[in-house]
UniProtKB/Swiss-Prot annotation:
Domain Myosin N-terminal SH3-like: 33-82
Species of provenance: Bos taurus (Bovine)
IQ domain segment(s): 786-815
Location relative to the cell: Cytoplasm, Myofibril
GO molecular function, one term: microfilament motor activity
Protein name: Myosin-2
Domain notes: The rodlike tail sequence is highly repetitive, showing cycles of a 28-residue repeat pattern composed of 4 heptapeptides, characteristic for alpha-helical coiled coils.
Length: 1940
């Protein structure tokens, strides 16, 4: 967490991004009771905060913050997170993760205006409804280059991470911004574009290109200007949002190789074109209309022939016309300038405005109806003239085309009349088409302008699309939007978790696949599969007579009862009607299909389109230049009556799916970043948040699932080499130096040696995987370690400098003592007479000798100087030679490496080719076998097709014959009208009853059965009519009696029907109640699993804290050792100082001796000394310059070496990233190939399923005929069915009571657990006290460490005390750690095993059904992908394999290079240390010279003082001499000089004192810093102690409660699962029986009506019915036997399962006992038990699948036999009917007079029957044509498969040839390798010789330096000897003078 100082870079945005330090400290210190602080469910606010008052009987009493008291169930109370998690930036880090915690975290952050929050891998943003300063330029710069964890959540952080990932990973990126309308998607999209335009500017100056008088901007300006233009034409005011985007867009921003902007393009989706002609009251149309009418540019008003009042134009004035937050005038200026910046020509700009104005005029076109006709005609031509003028059309032609369009009939065009309504609809469709096409053209034109043709490498895509929509009325638009979000959510899940888990398996990590219930494949395939919703919709659009109801019926026939995601909608009062419901991931959505066919076809007037194409307005002609019937870009067409979907007829849904597939392809090729936008309230109030609205959006966006996924898996991973390189610093001793070790082993050793939770990471084959947060912890540890190393290095350096300074101070003190001693001695002897004489004579003796000595010294100095220059020149030459040799050496190494890499690449490529050849041969064999199977299946299908065609032709002939007979009967019926007048009234009543019965039948039957039953009924009527011709006389007498009987039976049937309906409603209600109970139990189970996962995470956190505590103890031990080392160093330095002091004392004695020997000095001696000092200083400066130059060259060499090493490291990192990316792509390609292979295997199964479907259709036809014979028996069975339903409903109620009892039992168990938790809390408090004592011991240890620095005398005793304290602490920590580790391991393993067992049992029943549905639904899609992509995929795989091999080889070579460079670095480091040692020795010598110089200055001062005294004495002695005056004058001058020198010496002394004070200040500052560091460490330790206490309390409470909860939880779940399975079985049986009863009731009514007409034929049909009944009984008996066998097998499996459960428990107990003795074998035993469970479950699943497959095979055989027998029966019945019809024809003449009396009664009924029969025949013919089309398409697919097989064979031949060529290349390369190896050896020898030569040169240089130092020493010795000789000469001279 950043400090307030670090947040200062964000400027005024800082408080809107992150909490301040003060607020964080207050949150940590805030009192909190984890037991009672909860969230509670509340009806109004969804969730509120409260405190628990009491718990009784499964109920909890909670007092809310508002003071209210609520009593709720246990499952409606959720624990609250500690205060430190308040306003947390990443919600995945929360301890308790549930809906109220997420909601209140967002709410509290929103209240503080922190609108961005991380949620796992994605970012959640809440619309603030106000301006916030979080997008300022300083914020952009602050986020640039920051990692995600280094900065607060922000859209800029997401953008910068995407940009950095693109640069580092070399991979395309995408940012997916989703949310509801008004949530802020468009604003965030703008901010993303703003960020990229700011940080990735091209850097070019603005270019002004004059194109038709317009000035274009730079690429950045054009990208930013695209938004105002698109918003003007694509945004509008809605109820929720004043600037709502009514289209989706995907903006791709392309970058060059350097990361600069290169180009951009935009793709749009689902423009809401209906808004052009219709708006709701609170909304308005697109902004451009109101901008034009704002009169900001009056020339537009004149040009477009419009007014400034929007109410004059109905198309744009149906809602509001102004928006308070939008200034239309200013927006028009922005739009107009955007058009100019984007490079539109003036002509194009005028065209845009004209077409917009024409759309406005279209709304004013009026038409009226002609008198006495339905034909429409124009009502005035003024508006049409304006619209035609703007579009450059003829108004008369336009009106004619609208009112009298030309329609193609056959090969000719016919003029068709239109009604007013049709013309009005056509005008609206044209307006919408013109606007939509213009919008899409503008987007394409913008893309053309943004494509700068610059080189581009990668792109970042920004997706702004509408979120999931659930309204009261949902139409086709909502289905498209929801389907898009379904695909995006599946992409999100696939990216976040499916790919993650697949990578775990590839990497060899032990992982159990976790299904989070978010698999959306079933819903997606239901919508887009070949027989899905979109497919059926497009098929219906092909038929001219199709209606919305026929579309609905087809949906029900295809999916109802077959797909779990397709349901009938529930009827809710007050809501619009819904026709079907889909189960989406965000909820159940009811859809209304009214008008879907018209919306999908989107018809246009062909004649008007033809006029548009010929328009003089080029833009309009270009928009409609595609085809006469539409444009694929506009996603519509006007071709009517087409039966096949071709290029000229592309529906809205087809275009939408095409665009969506392109979008998903783009997204899959990128690395996605997700942003979820949330709308806080419906009233646009800043700061207010509606809980229910936000929760609904969180569920729709999958926020909670995303967090759970992130926490469950291993979201962080890193390559072993990268991990070793980056984190080796954490424990360098774990990886041995000087020997090679594999990166994986090194990483394992390194992680094992670090104090972290070892369950939080896993080792794969190439990477190490981490749980969420662990990598951040390692980064923190690394930063801390680096900080420690830096502080340790700084401490060493500062200590060294302090010791040097201290040494100087000691030397100064000793020298001061020496000077004081000498001065005192001198003051004692200076008045002695002999000393006065000595002072006078000594200078005279030394002057001559000193001159000679100085001359010799100058000569020697000049010689040494020349030698030094020569040595420097030689050294430079040698260095230049060394540099050239190093360059040559590097070049040779690079050549060798490149050649070696080429050889290795060739070898690996050859190996890969051989492997791929073998794999391809195996795959080709499999493909050929599958192709043969498909050919056989195809042959069988063609034979069946031919049989069906023959049968259909025979049926057509029979139908024709029946139609002829019916026509004859109609003629005879008209002749007998007069004879049946007295019976017409009774027949009319009979007809009414028949109509009522048919209506009731239609209501009870389902859609597909209705059509088939009607056909059968009509055939029965025809049969009865033909037979009735022979029996009309007998029926006349019986009609009246039968009518009465029929009325009675009808009344009985109505009463029975009412009873059945009541029973049905009761059963349905009971079923709904049971389902609700089941859902509640499932939710409880999920919550329990969630609590278990939370407890596991707490245990892991507790372990991590224990490890951190142990780490601190180790750090303290290390600190003690460091202090001991410092004490030893201080002792050594003290001994060294004593030694130096003794040396100085000796030197002082020597100086005193010299002083005694020395005499007075004259002015000439003083001048000579000054000259000598000047020359000495010059020599010293020359020496210092030489040393500085040498150090500068050494530093430059070191810097150059470090830069080269850093560059190589960066190159290695980049190559490793590329390698990682290629490995990822390689694994993905392999997965796709495996999927394709598995899909090819399932094609044959799919065809078998298709055959089964055909057979089932045939069986349904045959079953209808057999059911006709069973109807009498089924009527009697209805009453028994009803009784059975009543008993079953009673059984359900009893089961419901049992469930309620079970729930109460669970609540009692939970109450017992709470009591145990309270006991554990008391124990926890005792442990806290013990822990505080431990913390006190640690503080005392730290205090002892501080005392070590001050108390040197007591160091041994304090050390012993610290060791005792630390050993005690270590033992206690070890005990706690072992205790917690053993308990946690045992309990976590038990929990994991229990969880796995429960998950397997819960999902066992669903996995088989889901797998079968997924396989069947994906067959067609997989087959197409296989045929289209196999060849491309194989090529891609070969390329990626070769690239991966090359990169692997390069990686190995770079590792070798890196090792060599490391070795060289160590060598240079050693040389550097040697040079530093030499520099230090030179520094000490320089220090000695400085001391000598200071001593000479002191001597000079004493000499001057002595000189002064001597001159004073001489002036006293020579008062009587005449030259006394002159002497006095000279002495005064000398005095002034001496005083000046004295002042200079005093100034120097003051400077030395100031420097001493400065050094003392430094020491004080260092001490202050040490104190601050100490206080900071104490504060951090205190904070950690508090965290340890809190987590320890949570851990103990959770661990103890889980042990008691586990057994009860397992028992309750087992009971619930058994009860659930039983209820599901009973429910399925009830549904089957209910459907069966409905079907039988309908068929009974139909049979009753038919039996009255054929009384004499009952005996014949009775015999047939008895035969059919016997067959059915046999079949029923067989089915029952099979069911009994299956039930017995299920019972056996259950028994075995229970037995295995008992054995598992026994094994677990034995395992726990053994683990106490041998902990090393514990993990092996648990893994064996887990594999055993998996194998048992797999065996049971395989057995179940085998039984299902065998059952399906038996059913298929039986259905085939039955179909053959039914076909034979149908043929026999057809022959019989032909015979009877011929017989009836012969008897017609004899019975003609009798028939006329009764024929009139049946007139109306027969007409109705005939009409229905014809319709059914037409439907059957259409169905036959559809089946023929399907068979033809299947044949085409088989032909394509054969072609693909041939392509594979050709490819195999090419590969074999290529392998032979590769072998030859390998032989050539082998020879080349031998030659290169010889060259490498020679180069190595040359390099070694060069290195030896450089070493010799260095040694020579060092030798010269040493000789120079010796020469200087010799010069000093010579100078001292010269001084002695001068003294002696002066003594001799005085003796001679005295003798004279």
């Amino acid at each position: 967490m950043s400090s307030d100082q670090e947040m200062a870079i964000f400027g005024e945005a800082a408080p809107y991004l992150r909490k301040s330090e003060k607020e964080r400290i207050e949150a940590q210190n805030k009192p909190f009771d984890a037991k009672t602080s909860v969230f509670v469910a509340e009806p109004k606010e969804s969730f509120v905060k409260g405190t628990i008052q009491s718990r009784e009987g499964g109920k909890v009493t909670v007092k809310t913050e508002g003071g209210a008291t609520l009593t709720v169930k246990e499952d409606q109370v959720f624990p609250m997170n500690p205060p430190k998690f308040d306003k947390i930036e990443d919600m995945a880090m929360m301890t308790h993760l549930h809906e109220p915690a997420v909601l209140y975290n967002l709410k509290e952050r929103y209240a503080a205006w922190m609108i961005y929050t991380y949620s796992g891998l994605f970012c959640v943003t809440v619309n603030p409804y106000k301006w916030l300063p979080v997008y300022n330029p300083e914020v952009v710069t602050a986020y640039r280059g920051k990692k995600r964890q280094e900065a607060p959540p922000h859209i800029f952080s997401i953008s910068d991470n995407a940009y950095q990932f693109m640069l580092t990973d070399r991979e395309n990126q995408s940012i997916l911004i989703t949310g509801e309308s008004g949530a802020g998607k468009t604003v965030n999209t703008k901010r993303v574009i703003q960020y990229f335009a700011t940080i990735a500017v091209t850097g070019d100056k603005k270019k002004e290109e004059i194109t038709s008088g317009k000035i274009q901007g730079t690429l950045e300006d054009q990208i930013i200007s695209a938004n105002p233009l698109l918003e003007a034409f694509g945004n509008a005011k809605t109820v929720r949002n004043d600037n709502s985007s009514r289209f989706g867009k995907f903006i791709r921003i392309h970058f060059g190789t350097t990361g600069k902007l290169a180009s951009a393009d935009i793709e749009t989706y689902l423009l809401e074109k209906s808004r052009v002609t219709f708006q709701l009251k609170a909304e308005r149309s697109y902004h451009i209309f109101y901008q034009i009418t704002s009169n900001r540019k009056p020339e537009l008003i004149e040009m477009l022939l419009i007014t400034t009042n929007p109410y004059d134009y109905p198309f744009i004035s149906q809602g509001e016309i102004s928006v308070a937050s939008i200034d239309d005038q200013e927006e028009l200026i922005a739009t107009d300038s955007a058009i100019d910046i984007l490079g539109f020509t003036n002509e194009e700009k005028v065209s845009i405005y004209k077409l917009t104005g024409a759309v406005m005029h279209y709304g004013n076109l009026k038409f009226k109806q002609k008198q006495r006709e339905e034909q429409a005609e124009p009502d005035g031509t003024e508006v049409a003239d304006k619209a035609a003028y703007l579009q450059s059309l003829n108004s008369a032609d336009l009106l004619k085309a609208l009112c009298y369009p030309r329609v193609k009939v056959g090969n000719e065009y016919v003029t068709k009349g239109q009604t007013v309504e049709q013309v009005t609809n056509a005008v609206g469709a044209l307006a919408k088409a013109v606007y939509e096409k213009m919008f899409l053209w503008m987007v394409a034109r913008i893309n053309q302008q943004l494509d700068t043709k610059q080189p581009r490498q990668y792109f970042i895509g920004v997706l702004d699309i509408a979120g999931f929509e659930i309204f009261d009325f949902n139409s086709l638009e909502q289905l498209c939007i929801n389907f898009t979000n379904e695909k995006l959510q599946q992409f999100f899940n696939h990216h976040m978790f499916v790919l993650e888990q697949e990578e775990y398996k590839r990497e060899g990590i032990e992982w159990t696949f976790i299904d989070f219930g978010m698999d959306l494949a079933a819903c997606i395939e239901l919508i887009e599969k070949p027989m899905g919703i979109f497919s059926i919709l497009e098929e219906e659009c092909m038929f001219p007579k199709a209606t919305d109801m026929s579309f609905k019926n087809k949906l029900y026939d295809q999916h109802l009862g077959k797909s779990a995601n397709f349901q009938k909608p529930k009827v809710v009062k007050g809501k619009p009607e819904a026709h079907f419901a889909l189960i989406h991931y965000a909820g159940v959505v009811d859809y209304n299909i009214t008008g879907w066919l018209e919306k999908n076809k989107d018809p246009l007037n062909d004649t008007v389109v033809g006029l548009y194409q010929k328009s003089a307005l080029k833009t309009l002609a270009f928009l409609f230049s595609g085809t006469p019937t539409g444009d694929s870009e506009a996603s519509g067409g006007t071709k009517k009556g087409g039966k096949k979907k071709g290029s000229s007829f592309q529906t809205v849904s087809a275009l939408f799916r095409e665009n969506l597939n392109k979008l998903m392809t783009n997204l899959r090729s990128t690395h996605p970043h997700f942003v979820r936008c949330i709308i806080p309230n419906e009233t646009k109030t800043p700061g207010a948040m509606e809980h229910e609205l936000v929760l609904h959006q969180l569920r729709c966006n999958g926020v909670l699932e995303g967090i759970r996924i992130c926490r469950k898996g291993f979201p962080s991973r890193i390559l072993y080499a990268d991990f070793k390189q980056r984190y080796k610093v954490l424990n360098a001793s774990a990886i041995p130096e000087g020997q090679y070790i594999d990166s994986k082993k090194a990483s394992e050793k390194l992680l094992a040696s670090i104090d972290i939770d070892h369950t939080q990471y896993k080792f794969g084959h190439t990477k190490v995987f981490f749980k969420a947060g662990l990598l951040g912890l390692l980064e923190e540890m690394r930063d801390e370690k680096l900080a420690q190393l830096m502080t340790r290095t700084q401490a060493r350096c500062r200590g060294f400098l302090a010791r040097v300074e201290y040494q100087k101070m000691v030397e100064r003190r000793e020298s001061i003592f020496c000077i004081q001693y000498n001065i005192r001695a001198f003051m004692n002897v200076k008045h002695w007479p002999w000393m006065k004489l000595f002072f006078r004579i000594k200078p005279l003796l030394k002057s001559a000798e000193t001159e000679k000595e100085m001359a010799t010294m100058k000569e020697e100095f000049q010689k040494t100087k020349d030698e030094l220059a020569k040595s420097e020149a030689k050294r430079k030459e040698l260095e230049e030679k060394m540099v050239t040799l190093l360059k040559e050496k590097n070049d040779l190494q690079l050549q060798v490496q490149s050649e070696a890499e080429g050889l290795a690449d060739a070898e690996e490529r050859c190996d890969q080719l051989i492997k791929t050849k073998i794999q391809l041969e195996a795959k080709i064999k499999e493909v050929t076998e599958r192709a043969e199977d498909e050919e056989e299946i195809n042959a069988e299908l063609t034979a069946k097709k031919r049989k069906l065609e023959d049968e259909c032709s025979e049926l057509k002939k029979d139908i024709d014959d029946l139609e002829l007979t019916l026509a004859k009967v109609e003629k005879e019926k008209h002749a007998t009208e007069n004879k049946v007048k007295n019976l017409t009234e009774e027949m009319a009543g009979l007809d009414e009853t028949i109509a009522k019965l048919t209506k009731e039948k239609k209501a009870l039957q389902e859609a597909h059965q209705q059509t088939l039953d009607d056909l059968q009924a009509e055939e029965d009527k025809v049969n009865t009519l033909t037979k009735a011709k022979t029996k009309l006389e007998q029926q006349v007498d019986d009609l009246e009696g039968s009518l009465e009987q029929e009325k009675k039976l009808r009344m009985d049937l109505e009463r029975a029907k009412r009873k059945l309906e009541g029973d049905l409603k009761l059963a349905q209600e009971s079923i709904m109640d049971i389902e609700n109970e089941k859902q509640q139990l499932d939710e409880k189970l999920k919550k329990k699993e969630f609590e278990i996962s939370n407890l596991q995470s707490k245990i892991e956190d507790e372990q991590a804290l224990g490890i951190q505590l142990q780490k601190k103890i180790k750090e303290l031990q290390a600190r003690i050792e460091e202090l001991e080392e410092e004490i030893e160093a201080e002792r050594a330095s003290r001994a060294k100082a004593e030694k130096q002091r003794s040396d100085l004392s000796r030197e002082l004695e020597e100086i005193s001796e010299r002083l005694e020997e020395a005499g007075g000095a004259t002015s000439a001696q003083i001048e000579m000394n000054k000259k000598r000092e000047a020359e000495f200083q010059k020599m010293r400066r020359d020496l210092e310059e030489a040393t500085l130059q040498h150090e500068a060259t050494a530093a430059a060499l070191r810097k150059k070496h470090a830069d080269s090493v850093a560059e190589l490291g960066e190159q290695i990192d980049n190559l490793q990233r590329v390698k990682q990316k290629l490995e990822k792509e390689k694994s993905e390609m392999k997965m796709e190939i495996d999927d394709l292979a598995s899909n090819v295997e399932t094609i044959s199964k799919a065809k078998g399923n298709l055959e089964k479907m055909c057979r089932t259709l045939e069986d349904q036809v045959n079953e209808l005929k057999s059911k006709e014979e069973e109807q009498q028996r089924l009527i009697n069975d209805l009453t028994t069915q009803r009784g059975r339903l009543q008993t079953e409903s009673g059984e359900f109620s009893r089961q419901l009571d049992e469930k309620e009892a079970l729930v109460s039992q669970l609540s009692r168990g939970k109450q017992a657990f709470t009591q145990q938790i309270e006991e554990l809390k008391r124990q926890l408090e005792e442990e806290i006290k013990a822990k505080n004592a431990l913390a006190h011991g640690l503080q005392s240890a730290r205090h002892d460490c501080d005392l070590l620095r001050e108390q040197y005398e007591e160091e041994q005793e304090s050390k012993a005390e610290l060791q005792r304290a630390l050993s005690k602490a270590n033992t206690e920590v070890a005990q706690w750690r072992t205790k917690y580790e053993t308990d946690a391991i045992q309990r976590t393993e038990e929990l994991e095993e229990a969880k796995k067992k429960l998950a397997q049992r819960l999902q066992a029943a669903e996995e088989h059904v889901e797998a079968v549905n997924a396989k069947c639904a994906s067959l067609e899609k997989t087959k197409q992908r296989l045929q289209n992509e196999v060849e491309d995929l194989m090529l891609d795989v070969e390329r990626t394999n070769a690239a991966c091999a090359a990169l692997d080889k390069k990686q190995r070579n770079f590792d070798k290079i890196l090792a060599e460079w490391k070795q060289k670095y160590e060598e240079t480091h050693a040389e550097l240390e040697a040079a530093q040692k030499e520099a230090r020795s030179l520094g000490t010598e320089l220090f000695k010279m400085k001391n000598a110089y200071e001593e000479s200055l002191d001597q000079l001062e004493t000499l001057k003082r002595e000189n002064k005294n001597l001159q004073q004495e001489i002036s006293d002695l020579t008062e009587q001499i005449a030259e006394g005056g002159k002497r006095m004058h000279e002495l005064e001058k000398i005095k002034k000089q001496v005083e000046q020198e004295k002042s200079e010496i005093q100034a120097a002394l003051e400077e030395a004192e100031a420097s001493l004070e400065h050094e003392e200040g430094k020491i004080l500052r260092i001490q202050l810093e040490l104190n601050q560091v100490k206080s900071e460490i104490d504060r951090k330790i205190a904070e950690k102690d508090e965290e340890i206490d809190q987590l320890k309390r949570n851990h103990i409470r959770v661990v103890e409660s889980m042990q008691t909860m586990l057994d009860a939880e397992i028992r309750s779940r087992n009971d619930a699962i058994r009860l659930k399975k039983k209820m599901e079985g009973d429910l399925n049986e009830m549904e089957i029986q209910l459907n069966h009863a409905n079907r039988m009731a309908a068929e009974a009514l139909k049979n009753y009506r038919n039996t009255q007409a054929i009384l004499k034929d009952t005996q014949i049909h009775l015999d047939d019915a008895l035969r059919g009944q016997e067959d059915l009984k046999e079949q029923l008996a067989m089915v029952e036997r099979r069911a009994n066998l299956l039930q017995a097998e299920i019972e056996e499996l259950r028994a075995t399962l229970e037995q295995t459960e008992r054995s598992r428990k026994i094994a677990e107990q034995e395992l726990l006992d053994a683990s106490e003795r041998v902990q090393l074998l514990h993990t092996q035993n648990t893994s064996l038990i887990n594999t055993k469970k998996k194998l048992e479950t797999d065996i049971t699943q395989i057995q179940g699948e085998m039984e299902d497959i065998l059952q399906e095979a038996r059913n298929a055989e039986e259905k085939a036999k039955k179909a053959i027998t039914d076909a034979a029966m149908m043929a026999e019945e057809l022959k019989k009917e032909q015979d009877t019809s011929a017989h009836l024809e012969r008897m017609k003449k004899n019975m003609e007079q009798t028939v006329k009396d009764l024929q009139n009664r049946l007139d109306e009924a027969e007409q109705l029957a005939l009409k229905g029969g014809k319709k059914q025949i037409q439907k059957l013919e259409a169905r036959v044509r559809e089946l023929e089309g399907e068979v033809e398409s299947e044949q085409k697919r088989n032909v394509e498969a054969v072609k693909g097989l041939r392509k594979h064979e050709r490819r195999v031949k090419e590969l074999t040839y290529q392998t032979e060529e590769d072998r030859k290349n390998i032989l050539r390369l082998q020879d080349l390798v031998d030659k290169l190896q010889a060259k490498v050896k020679s180069y190595k020898r040359q390099a070694e010789e060069a290195e030896e030569q450089s070493n010799t040169n260095l040694s020579k240089f060092r030798k010269l330096q040493h000789e120079l130092e010796e020469a200087e020493e010799r010069a000093d010795i010579a100078e001292s000897q010269v001084n002695k000789l001068r003294v002696k000469s002066r003594e001799v001279h005085t003796k001679i003078i005295s003798e004279e």
